[in-house]
Amino acid sequence: MAACATHSSLMLAYAAASTRSQDLTPTPSLFSFASSRPNHLSFPLLLLGGSRDRRCAAIDRASNHKFIVSAVAAEADLDTEEDLEQTATAVLDPPKPKKGKAALVLKRDRTRSKRFLEIQKLRETKKEYDVNTAISLLKQTANTRFVESVEAHFRLNIDPKYNDQQLRATVSLPKGTGQTVIVAVLAQGEKVDEAKSAGADIVGSDDLIEQIKGGFMEFDKLIASPDMMVKVAGLGKILGPRGLMPNPKAGTVTANIPQAIEEFKKGKVEFRADKTGIVHIPFGKVNFTEEDLLINFLAAVKSVETNKPKGAKGVYWKSAHICSSMGPSIKLNIREMIDFKPPTAN
């Protein structure tokens, strides 16, 4: 009888617990033990008033069912942990790279040619060279199959967005530019004959203006007489972006057309500071002698110094470099460059 009493108390406690957990019954999608048959967990409550044997049998069935439910619940917890581990592993796995068109190589990642790397060893990157050494080194670094141009690049302490700090001028290179310059002239009346006599390659008036509007650009310099500027003004959108618009500061608007033609044929070069305050001036070819390159370079330096803008303040020269078309830049010592005096002939 004591055993049955013990079983009865256990049965009541378990029946109460199973009654509270009815809402937590696993769904059929996760567990396979759920069925449509009546739930036996509540059955012992109906047998409380029956005989001893029937009560004991009910207790045994409830106990066995409890063990089954516990085992299934433990298995469900294990499956849930495995699912969580798989989810965490999927999150930690790095995403696979997307397949598509390869990205362009950045400029800093591009490799230089073997030729450039070899000639780059001839000069030290941060060293400032004197003018004579720099020009000699420049000729050594020019080893392409064509005749390269030689250029000077001066960084000035100016801001061209202000009118009093703009720089635009010309320089006559004593030894020429090393290339043939095709000069076109817009003139009328007797100026036409003067231009032809002075060696102009193309001479015209209204007819030449119409050709330019139609896309004719077979010339390097365009010179115009002052009386033609009213008609030339309409060509600004065509000539301006190409740097061919006649301008008094560039010496391409003048009444003395023969002199202008002669100067440009001999090597007169126009230059101007870009928006960052840098001036780019070509001063010859690599097949020039070192002496001729030196003379042209000093003429360019003198012109930049002479045409210093009125609004320039502080130190005017910030840096100076020279280079060939396909070669590395060579940094110059600015103080030595400005104070340099060519040797006098004996």
UniProtKB/Swiss-Prot annotation:
The keyword rRNA-binding applies. The keyword Ribonucleoprotein applies. The modification Phosphotyrosine is found at residue 129. Residues 1-70 form a transit peptide. It is found in: Plastid, Chloroplast. Its main location: plastid. Keywords: Chloroplast, Phosphoprotein, Plastid, Ribonucleoprotein, Ribosomal protein, RNA-binding, rRNA-binding, Transit peptide. GO terms for biological process: translation. The modification Phosphothreonine is found at residue 177. GO terms for molecular function: mRNA binding; rRNA binding; structural constituent of ribosome. Coiled coil: none annotated. One of its GO terms (cellular component) is chloroplast envelope. It comes from the Eukaryota. It holds the Pfam family Ribosomal_L1. SUPFAM superfamilies: Ribosomal protein L1. The modification Phosphoserine is found at residue 197. This protein binds directly to 23S ribosomal RNA. HAMAP family: Ribosomal_uL1_B (MF_01318_B). Part of the 50S ribosomal subunit. Belongs to the universal ribosomal protein uL1 family. This is Large ribosomal subunit protein uL1c.
